[in-house]
Amino acid sequence: MGLSGVLHVEVEVKSPAEKFWVALGDGINLFPKAFPNDYKTIQVLAGDGNAPGSIRLITYGEGSPLVKISAERIEAVDLENKSMSYSIIGGEMLEYYKTFKGTITVIPKDGGSLLKWSGEFEKTAHEIDDPHVIKDFAVKNFKEIDEYLLKQTSA
């Protein structure tokens, strides 16, 4: 098995694409409030937190399976196609992966959304597992965001 790879996952949710995309854009405020077990804080260290070049420091809660802190830089945002890419630039994850770049795309589908997530990585050593735990955490978060948004709609 090589040191580099890519993981992909698709998740269908009931929330409309526009609503889900807005929630992702407000993750700095929304995630620690709505999902305190997963996110303790998200601080903006540079930029506005959403534009390319922005840097965010994420302190994870007990629900995070791999790391407790990471810094990520927003690499690209495509508002029209509801897509954003980020790179991990600091924190414990760099002990396992020399590089990690994630991409999230929100696509309208049948009144809900199709979420596509991919993670490109380069491991620090052959013994390191592929980051399936990170992929699974992303899927869990997508489902939690959907549940949260659906509760807000029905409230």
From Swiss-Prot:
GO terms for biological process: abscisic acid-activated signaling pathway; defense response. It comes from the Eukaryota. Pfam families: Bet_v_1. GO terms for molecular function: abscisic acid binding; protein phosphatase inhibitor activity; signaling receptor activity. SUPFAM superfamilies: Bet v1-like (SSF55961). GO terms for cellular component: cytosol; nucleus. InterPro entries: Bet_v_I/MLP, Bet_v_I_allergen, MLP-like_ligand-binding, START-like_dom_sf. Signal peptide: none annotated. Belongs to the MLP family. This is MLP-like protein 423.
